[in-house]
């Protein structure tokens, strides 16, 4: 990789990692540091998503440092970190994807089935679901820990790069293209890409239809049947719900854009047996897109959620005043529950 190409990649990966790490740390602090916000089921899921995204960004750093800085796939770190990093990277990636699916199902129940929401989406049920999800992804990703190790390769030991960094090995899969590994990768493709994409798209489409088409309150905004107070509340609900829909669409769009290209390459090579040799720069770009998904969620919260922007100002400027505030939580269904609760949505 030439210097002209390498420098932009270095800057891009560094900026992406820094922005993603700082953004997710702020989300974690904003929720975990506020007792009122921790009472919201939705915020528990957002906290879980931020933890998974933050850890995923951290454990992908050993993956992109060698190719971005040195133009190779050499492993720079102790050998035992190869299977550990690869395993944890996949665990947190799978947890991030599955948490997004849990979030969309929770939103569907809260919006489309509000009468069942209190029972189905209780704090206890959500915590159990999150725990089961982490156990599942930890078990599912275990082949990465078992079948990855550092492979020594022949290198020119007289080169300056070898003398400085001892670049002579790669962290790679030890079973190659065995049938069972291809079957595992196909299962991974279905479980953590195709099925989540299908469920998220279908569920959020139904949520959007419910918000835009089926709620008579949204269509009553300008009618004379509402008094001024009710009209104002309806207008506020309309604006809130529009922002929710925009955020849901943005999440789905980012998910597709970030993961579709690299999954198409995998499907073509592993399943359809199509011979593809994309340029190495293209592979780096695909990995950068995958990282972008983990880094973008805090930006989406800031862009679409007024409550998150308000909480962000509290964290950055007046953290001591947050606990003294009594907040009102407005549910997504235009039903207000007065009390010490807060949510980003």
Curated annotation (Swiss-Prot):
Query: Which cell locations does it reside in?
Result: Cell membrane
Provide the free-text tissue specificity comment from this protein's UniProt record: Expressed in pharyngeal muscle and AWC, ASG, ASE, ASI, and ASJ sensory neurons. Expressed in ASI neuron. Expressed in AFD neurons and in AVK interneuron.
Q: Which residues lie on this side of the membrane: Extracellular?
A: 1-11, 62-90, 147-187, 268-281
Top-level taxonomy: Eukaryota, Metazoa, Ecdysozoa, Nematoda, Chromadorea
Ranges in the topological domain labelled Cytoplasmic: 33-40, 112-125, 209-246, 305-345
Cystine pairs: 82-171
Q: Is GTP-binding among the key words of this record?
A: no
Q: What is this protein called?
A: Neuropeptide receptor 15
**Chief location of this protein within or outside the cell:** membrane
Q: What organism is listed for this UniProt entry?
A: Caenorhabditis elegans
Record keywords: Membrane included?
yes
Q: What does this protein do?
A: Probable receptor for neuropeptide ligand nlp-8 that plays a role in octopamine signaling and specifically, the octopamine inhibition of aversion responses in olfactory sensory neurons. Plays a crucial role in daf-7 expression. Acts in concert with gpa-4 to activate TGF-beta-like daf-7 secretion in the ASI neuron, thereby promoting larval development and inhibition of dauer diapause. Suppresses immune response against pathogenic infection by inhibiting transcription regulators elt-2 and hlh-30 in ASJ neuron. Promotes pathogen avoidance behavior via intestinal gon-2, independent of aerotaxis.
Q: Which UniProt keywords apply?
A: Cell membrane, Disulfide bond, G-protein coupled receptor, Membrane, Receptor, Transducer, Transmembrane, Transmembrane helix
CC per GO annotation? plasma membrane
InterPro entries per the UniProt record, alphabetical: GPCR_Rhodpsn, GPCR_Rhodpsn_7TM
What residue ranges are annotated as transmembrane?
12-32, 41-61, 91-111, 126-146, 188-208, 247-267, 282-304
Per the UniProt entry, what is one GO biological process? G protein-coupled receptor signaling pathway
């Amino acid at each position: 990789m030439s210097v002209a190409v390498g420098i932009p990649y270095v800057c891009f990966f560094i900026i992406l990692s820094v922005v993603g790490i700082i953004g997710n740390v702020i989300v974690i602090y904003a929720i975990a540091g506020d007792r009122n916000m921790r009472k919201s089921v939705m915020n528990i899921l957002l906290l879980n998503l931020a933890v998974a995204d933050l850890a995923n960004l951290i454990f992908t750093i050993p993956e992109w440092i060698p190719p971005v800085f040195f133009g190779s796939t050499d492993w720079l770190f102790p050998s035992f970190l190869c299977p550990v990093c690869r395993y944890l990277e996949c665990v947190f990636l799978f947890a991030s994807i599955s948490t997004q699916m849990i979030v969309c199902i929770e939103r569907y129940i809260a919006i489309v089935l509000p009468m069942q929401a209190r029972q189905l989406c209780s704090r206890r049920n959500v915590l159990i679901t999150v725990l089961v999800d982490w156990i599942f992804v930890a078990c599912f990703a275990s082949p990465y820990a078992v079948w990855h190790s550092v492979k020594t390769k022949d290198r020119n030991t007289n080169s300056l790069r070898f003398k400085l960094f001892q670049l002579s090995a790669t962290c790679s899969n030890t079973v190659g293209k065995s049938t069972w590994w291809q079957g595992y990768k196909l299962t991974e493709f279905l479980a953590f890409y195709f099925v989540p994409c299908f469920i998220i798209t279908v569920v959020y489409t139904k949520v959007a239809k419910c918000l835009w088409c089926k709620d008579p309150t949204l269509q009553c905004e300008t009618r004379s049947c509402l008094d001024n107070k009710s009209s104002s509340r309806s207008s506020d609900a309309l604006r809130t719900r529009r922002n929710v829909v925009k955020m849901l669409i943005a999440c789905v769009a980012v998910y597709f854009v970030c993961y579709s290209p690299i999954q198409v390459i995998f499907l073509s090579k592993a399943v359809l047996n199509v011979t593809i040799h994309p340029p190495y720069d293209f592979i780096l770009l695909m990995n950068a897109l995958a990282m972008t998904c983990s880094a973008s969620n805090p930006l989406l919260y800031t862009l679409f959620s007024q409550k998150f922007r308000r909480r962000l100002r509290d964290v950055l400027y007046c953290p001591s005043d947050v606990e003294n505030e009594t907040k009102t939580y407005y549910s997504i269904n235009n039903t207000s529950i007065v009390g010490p609760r807060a949510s980003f949505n």
